[in-house]
């Protein structure tokens, strides 16, 4: 069942109204910390903040589109630009959360060995690789398989379809035969792989916390911090990617689910700054790393 256009519009507007100031504050806070001491976590937080800010800027147009029942309100030539601005940060955010998770897991489980590779320059390289992977894969899908692409035999502009009602639609009226595999490939590489990495790393972090000397209260706080990124991936970006899997398995499924998933994905711009901001201030996992490092040093 589709959400009413007015409700979809209100949810997009609310996500923009909350997400824009939160991400601006998150980026400013990360920059302030970076001036004192740049760490890999700050590099990932800065990239995640910029990614979410780009996604946030695209939400007003998504709100207008929802209010118009999916009709594209701008010139057709701007559809590919909007597609990259909206979907690239939606996928890149999962990669940055996975990288942040991996860094914290390595710091908690292997504190001495990780220190040798804990360099911001390596983290910048990881972020550049994530951006390149997302943009290249997304660009190939758009150019080859989107409406108006090389493998599409229509004469429409790239990304634009015109259903029977005559209103142009941007990226939401693909032929199911080509849309299903294309979207599934994006979800498999750019969501489910980062999700698996994040889940594995945070289970490892929780095991490290269980064997640490922290108080019960600080263990609970650190455990909540550890689950924040995983919870964001599952609650915000998970429904959209689940709809991609459903439409791949059955082209008749996933339409309404996809619209709801795009809305929950938009709300990642609200939760991500809260998660990364809390991670940046929380002492839990850093204390675990310090305790384990001191313990390993004393044993020597």
Curated annotation (Swiss-Prot):
Residues bearing attached sugar chains per UniProt: 155
Location (main, coarse): membrane
Cytoplasmic topological segments: 32-41, 102-121, 201-223, 280-300
GO cellular component, one term: plasma membrane
GO biological process, one term: positive regulation of cytosolic calcium ion concentration
Keywords attached to this entry: Cell membrane, Disulfide bond, G-protein coupled receptor, Glycoprotein, Membrane, Receptor, Transducer, Transmembrane, Transmembrane helix
One MF term in the entry's GO annotations: bioactive lipid receptor activity
Record topological domains on the Extracellular side: 1-8, 65-79, 143-178, 249-256
Cysteines joined through disulfide linkages: 79-170
Membrane topology: Multi-pass membrane protein
UniProt keyword annotation of Transmembrane helix present: yes
TM stretches of this protein: 9-31, 42-64, 80-101, 122-142, 179-200, 224-248, 257-279
InterPro entries documented for this protein: GPCR_Rhodpsn, GPCR_Rhodpsn_7TM, GPR40-rel_orph, GPR40_recept_FA
Site keyed Important for receptor activation: positions: 145, 172
Superkingdom of source: Eukaryota
Subcellular location: Cell membrane
Pfam families in UniProt: 7tm_1 (PF00001)
Function text: G-protein coupled receptor for medium and long chain saturated and unsaturated fatty acids that plays an important role in glucose homeostasis. Fatty acid binding increases glucose-stimulated insulin secretion, and may also enhance the secretion of glucagon-like peptide 1 (GLP-1). May also play a role in bone homeostasis; receptor signaling activates pathways that inhibit osteoclast differentiation. Ligand binding leads to a conformation change that triggers signaling via G-proteins that activate phospholipase C, leading to an increase of the intracellular calcium concentration.
Recorded family membership: Belongs to the G-protein coupled receptor 1 family.
Protein name: Free fatty acid receptor 1
Gene: FFAR1
């Amino acid at each position: 069942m589709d959400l009413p256009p007015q409700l979809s519009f209100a949810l997009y507007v609310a996500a923009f109204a909350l997400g824009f100031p939160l991400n601006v504050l998150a980026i400013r806070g990360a920059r302030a910390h970076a001036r004192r001491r740049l760490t890999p976590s700050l590099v990932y937080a800065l990239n995640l903040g910029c990614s979410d800010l780009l996604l946030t800027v695209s939400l007003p147009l998504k709100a207008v589109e929802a209010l118009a029942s999916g009709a594209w309100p701008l010139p057709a030539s701007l559809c590919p630009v909007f597609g990259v601005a909206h979907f690239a940060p939606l996928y890149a955010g999962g990669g940055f959360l996975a990288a942040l998770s991996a860094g914290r897991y390595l710091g908690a489980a292997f504190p001495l060995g990780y220190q040798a590779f804990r360099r911001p320059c390596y983290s910048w390289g990881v972020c550049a690789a994530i951006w390149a992977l997302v943009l290249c894969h997304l660009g190939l899908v758009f150019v080859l398989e989107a409406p108006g692409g090389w493998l599409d035999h229509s004469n429409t502009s790239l990304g634009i379809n015109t259903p029977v009602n005559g209103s142009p639609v941007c990226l939401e009226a693909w032929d199911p035969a080509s849309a299903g595999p294309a979207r599934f490939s994006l979800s498999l590489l750019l969501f489910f792989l980062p999700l698996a990495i994040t889940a594995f790393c945070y289970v490892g972090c929780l095991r490290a916390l269980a064997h640490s000397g922290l108080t019960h209260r600080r263990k609970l706080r650190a455990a909540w911090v550890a689950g924040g990124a995983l919870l964001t991936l599952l609650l915000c970006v998970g429904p959209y990617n689940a709809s991609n899997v459903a439409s791949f398995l059955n082209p008749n499924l996933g339409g309404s689910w996809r619209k709801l998933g795009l809305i929950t994905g938009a709300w990642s711009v609200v939760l991500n700054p809260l998660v990364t901001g809390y991670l940046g201030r929380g002492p839990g996992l850093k204390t675990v790393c310090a305790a384990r490092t001191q313990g390993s040093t004393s044993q020597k």
